[in-house]
């Protein structure tokens, strides 16, 4: 079965071998090749080519995917009465990973320039700057007429126009577009199409669960003119390479249990922007329909260009399972989003699954445990002996009584539950067979308790000291779907560590300040509560946690006025000293802390910088937005025991998810009481990152590290020659603002330590025109290797900890479904975009909102956004932020999303990016904070009911301005001061200072802007909903969604409003899951799968008849398919999939056959 992450079974080749292979392929095709390297080395690499010749598929047989695509095209366009173009079968196939990168440059040149791209070999890899530095979504997406309606937010294209575009794409590409850069310096450059075959994942596999066990992929063939081969290098880097589509072993239809049954094609053809409307077959305006006139799909003058000569993507699809796309541009974002579109298309037709515009991460709480700890309190109820028994296949037990991991013996050590860790003597001590054993405590080793609790000897984020870091095995998988561009999808999985600032701990006057601290320690806290006294509490008591101290010194509505006044009277400096001393204090000090904390003598006088054990004490601070001037940072002190959550990225942008009934799972999960759960998988192998904060030198440490190592694919940065880099690095002060890796990379390049001719800096983006000047691009990009794949030991350790905590054996399946749904919105004050367009404000959102299902669906239907660096303009990104990239009616996605939320019982939260209200700029600071907060919340604290009952969430209030009242119901619930004080205390020393009242209540910042934002949102809600009514796709919506859309459009539906009890009951899980329309979805899934499996059997038998040599392999497939068919045809299957989302029947009902 094909695996996207593993790719083909051919070994990875280095650049020299790839050049040899390229030469061999060119020679076999009768083309000139640019080097003399056609040697025995090259012939050794001919395996794949000789395999093709053996099968006689190169010259005589069309690739199976192309045959499927051609059959579809011939049928689809038969009514047009014109020749259907033949898919080219003589393309240069990129059948080995890395071949596209080699073909992107002449072998002896370090740059390649053409009409559509400027490309450079750089020290860090390759830099490609396409003609446009960003994509637009306005007027771009065109869909060919078919039985399935074309949504109103897309432009409807007549079949004849698509057919003629297809001909012009393949037959009319300019000669210079077809030149393969690798051969550009040859006397006779090779002019050819280049193609890449891919199998992107659509449905994640769920181990051990019948009917869900097999991961399923779609298949896609991507064609580009030769000089755009870098686009295929990009796409391959993100989605992988499925080999040569002409080989039987790569035929998706011969891997039936791993294939959704869907096929796709994409063609890059920027030259099509020169075609006229008349050439395309569009009607004269006098013969055009009203829709064609409205969408300008007609002409008055014969020289009018199609789509006014601007970029467009044109889809041709129906519900049969084949999709073809023409893209009249070569910006990398369009290429990536096209694969996303085809994954989404396949997911919506197949069922069970969703393609989601999402980020996400597993976040585990992490704490500073100090210089010693007794680990027994962290592993209660777990025994080392039991852990050994359940993990006998993955660990090796040592005679001293500890164990090491078989896979990572140097980095993962398992220790007994009674272990005592001490930094002072670098030891871990425990009892074994009646005697004390001891092993060395060393850095960079995961010491794992029987319950998965992990302790690491860590140099702290400050220079204060070495410490023990404890990481809990309990986790929260934060899932950020339906998140607009710039809404924080990537940031949710980034470590907050890069945003942490270090600073020393100071005193004004040691003697006076220490007296003030002692007064706090001596204070009587027993009278703090308004509802009565509690027993006295002493801050330095070892049983009093640092969290309790933060609570004692944070104002609260639960406290008396006198206690709140007392807290307010303590200066921030004294509070910081209290926290510092509490974090260091040990019981054996017996109250004498003052002699342990010192200052140096400077010129005979006491200094101001505190020290402990000879080292400077430090504090950590975190930025949470900016002041109103939008340049001054709002910085707050973190707790003394703060460590960032241990995060493992699970998603970044394109996610495949599957809803699985909980009853089918073989081992426990976090929320077993839920009817179903969502399993997610990242569809991408590399992440197309936009490192916004890298323009601040030294701030984005990850990007600066990435830019210091080779092998990267980079775009929209400014290339520098050695001389330019020399000038760039003369400013020593600014040079040393970079972290060491980026600084050293620049210095080494200037010193001429490598052959590279060009380099880029992480802070110096591509210069693009803006009016009459050049400015840095706001859309710099690079492909980052997925962190979970880059550090497999950390990934393994994360899942191992969870497995141990759940007491699962190492042979049983481990499931880590979504725990929290935390979408993101990008907000903005009123402003003027770079393209001159005036942007209305979107300033009604607080840092975090909770929405009940109807309002959450409204958010998802409209998906409003402020301006993003990725795109021109702002407004609605369409349903679930996927509007531009959904080739089927959006109601299919919305039906799936609504049903998934209901089946899984998830609650919908939405966080803010860019701004909170019109005056607080927050960038991505809230997105970084949310996983830190959520990971430390107890499971019941994450539930809206609990948060509302305890005053942590409040209904958004109705607001009146100029005599008009704006209902707060549309905005759901928002976090309160109580939420900030209570939950931020797990992070900050003084949580009450982080989110002031007007930060949490945007209407207090500027009521006029708030009202205008609300008007804008309401108008957009209505306008978007009216589109579903106009194009008729509202009839494909499930009953609760259909009612909501009509209410958004008209204010009511069958006498119901949004507040009507009858309407809101339509979203009740019991009502939904017992409805006839839900049962129809399950039956549809069964019927489709039975039909597909029968079709698979026929294809397998046909292939055996044509190629008897494949009989042994394919007979095994036939047996597996027959077994699956028997199960899928049964009543048991229908019972088992109850709780899943089934398959939406709407697209199939649209088909006339």
Swiss-Prot record:
Its EC number is 4.1.1.38. It comes from the Eukaryota. It is found in: Cytoplasm, Cytosol. GO terms for molecular function: phosphoenolpyruvate carboxykinase (diphosphate) activity. GO terms for biological process: protein heterotrimerization. GO terms for cellular component: cytosol. It catalyses: oxaloacetate + diphosphate = phosphoenolpyruvate + phosphate + CO2. It is an enzyme of class 4 (lyase). Keywords: Coiled coil, Cytoplasm, Decarboxylase, Lyase. Residues 1085-1131 form a coiled coil. Monomer and trimer; forms heterotrimers with PEPCK1 and PEPCK2. Inorganic pyrophosphate (PPi)-dependent phosphoenolpyruvate carboxykinase, which regulates the carbon flow of the central metabolism by fixing CO(2) to phosphoenolpyruvate to produce oxaloacetate. Can also produce pyruvate and diphosphate from phosphoenolpyruvate and phosphate. Belongs to the PPi-type phosphoenolpyruvate carboxykinase family. This is PPi-type phosphoenolpyruvate carboxykinase 3. It comes from Entamoeba histolytica (strain ATCC 30459 / HM-1:IMSS / ABRM).
